[in-house]
């Protein structure tokens, strides 16, 4: 299988993801956020980190990166896309994952289990 890991300014663990995917037999390509086209892939991964800084909705800036239209087209055509941590936030900001990211009522970290 072929995969692509998208790297944004502030991404971390993108290289770890590259190593892990290769360990499991993927032929992985690292893709810079300013690229326009994805390489032929079966899986696209948006890793964690702090794209454009450690702020609420920092994924909103990353969602406007040049590569994201190709990621959206890939997902809409049935391609597998995985977002980890900030990568998930980017997917929410693009509209590929429904929902919105908001500050909570108390402006504090809350950890609780939820059932989806």
Predicted features and spans:
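N-terminal beta1-alpha1 cap of cysteine-dependent amidohydrolase-like domains
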Residues: 1-84, 91-98, 102, 108-113
């Amino acid at each position: 299988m072929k995969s692509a890991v998208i790297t944004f300014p502030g991404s971390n663990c993108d290289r770890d993801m590259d190593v892990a995917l290769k360990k499991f037999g993927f032929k992985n390509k690292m893709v810079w956020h300013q690229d326009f086209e994805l390489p032929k892939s079966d899986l696209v991964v948006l890793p964690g980190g702090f794209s454009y800084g450690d702020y609420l909705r920092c994924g909103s800036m990353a969602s406007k990166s040049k590569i994201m239209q190709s990621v959206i087209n890939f997902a809409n055509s049935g391609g597998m896309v995985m977002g980890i941590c900030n990568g998930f936030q980017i997917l929410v900001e693009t509209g590929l994952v429904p929902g919105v990211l908001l500050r909570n009522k108390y402006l504090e970290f809350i950890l609780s289990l939820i059932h989806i």
